[in-house]
Amino acid sequence: MLFVAEHTHPASECPMTMPSGKDMIKELFSEEHISNAGIELVGAYMSCPNDEGAIHKGYFIIEAVDEETIKNFFGPMKVEIREVKPFSEIAKTL
């Protein structure tokens, strides 16, 4: 099933501005971690570091068996995933 997970964080806490944060992101999106989590990462999009606003937003498109699998995938990430919603390609539902 296809899902979109949404994440936000304050710009002042952006992991992209800290070496430890960059390491965390590299580990999270490593092929090994993705494989072990049992997901397919279709796409990952963040407004940072280009967004100079107060809040950065991220959207992750993930193929997984259920919402819990996605939450487990993000477990090591020290940020909160706000929402995980199932999605489908609109043209295929018509």
Tell me the role of every PLM-derived stretch.
Residues M1-L94:
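Conserved, structured core segments of small domains
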